[in-house]
Amino acid sequence: SQYALCASQWHKTLTYKDDFFKDGMTYAADFQKQFDYDPPYQSAESSAALLVFKDAFERADSFDKKKVRDALAATDMQTFYGNIKFAPGGQNVDKPMVLFQVMCDSSGKCENKVVAPTKWASAKLIHPIPKWSDR
């Protein structure tokens, strides 16, 4: 799997922050401690969704559906998962995807490293990849 590329919504090394979960590394450590495995991006995005709903209910100061919907539509915040801002159609338009590359050390231990966008990269993309005969 070394050198394989994969797009994802989130990685624990991204430097987004919030007041509840703090950052991705803190979230991942707490998740690992609780569930005994690393959090997939789906868990992170679900946790961030709860922060968005909490914020919307507080700004709406109501459980009225229209007020909550309007508060959600006006959301513009950062969470440990990333920036959250909704377009008129409901899509989050303020959070880019990330690209991983599988990188292995000399012992054979492999892990995903963020290689793009460069603003969030934790490693440099290896391309072109070495020929099979050079590995």
Q: Where are the regions a protein language model picked out?
A:
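Extracellular/periplasmic bilobed ligand-binding domains
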Residues: 1-12
